[in-house]
C-alpha cells in the first residue's frame, strides 16, 4: 500500500516537473518560513493537498541538486530520482527537531541521487553474457 501511494505521488510530481522542464514555466518560489509551517501543520493533520504544495514549492531545490551531479544525458533521470527523495523527505520530516524543511529534504534528495549513482556505477563494471569477448563496441577484433 505504501509503495503504491509513493509511486502515484512520484508520477504526479514528475508530470508537474515535466511541465516546468519542457515549457517556459518556472518553478514556484520556495515557501517562506510561516507558509512552510502552515502547510506542514496542515499536512500533519492529514491534508494531502498541503503535501502537494510542499512538493511543488521544493521542486526548484530538486533541480538545483540534480544539476550538481548530472551531465547532459542524465539530468531528467536525476531530477526524477531527486523527486523521490523529496517525497520521502517530506514524509519523514519532523518539525519538532527545529530545522527547516529545505535543510532536511536537501539531504534526502542528495542521498537518493547519490545512492542511485553508486548503484549504477557498480553495474558499469559488469559484462553481459551476450557481449562478445575480444571485440570492441563496433565489432572490431582485438589482437
Per-region residue spans from a language model:
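Alpha-helical promoter-recognition and RNA polymerase-docking modules of transcription initiation factors
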Residues: 2-122
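Conserved small/polar residues in nucleotide/adenosyl-binding loops
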Residues: 141-143
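Long, serine/threonine/proline-rich intrinsically disordered regions in eukaryotic cortical polarity
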Residues: 133-137
Amino acid at each position: 500500500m505504501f509503495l503504491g501511494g509513493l509511486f502515484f505521488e512520484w508520477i504526479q510530481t514528475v508530470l508537474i516537473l515535466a511541465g516546468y522542464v519542457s515549457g517556459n514555466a518556472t518553478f514556484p518560489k520556495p515557501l517562506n518560513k510561516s507558509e512552510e509551517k502552515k502547510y506542514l501543520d496542515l499536512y500533519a493533520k492529514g491534508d494531502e493537498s498541503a503535501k502537494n504544495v510542499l512538493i511543488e514549492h521544493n521542486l526548484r531545490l530538486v533541480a538545483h541538486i540534480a544539476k550538481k551531479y548530472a551531465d547532459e544525458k542524465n539530468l531528467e533521470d536525476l531530477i526524477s530520482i531527486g523527486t523521490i527523495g523529496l517525497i520521502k523527505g517530506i514524509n519523514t520530516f519532523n518539525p519538532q527537531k527545529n530545522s527547516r524543511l529545505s535543510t532536511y529534504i536537501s539531504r534526502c534528495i542528495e542521498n537518493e541521487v547519490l545512492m542511485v549513482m553508486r548503484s549504477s556505477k557498480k553495474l558499469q563494471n559488469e559484462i553481459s553474457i551476450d557481449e562478445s569477448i575480444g571485440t570492441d563496441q563496433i565489432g572490431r577484433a582485438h589482437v
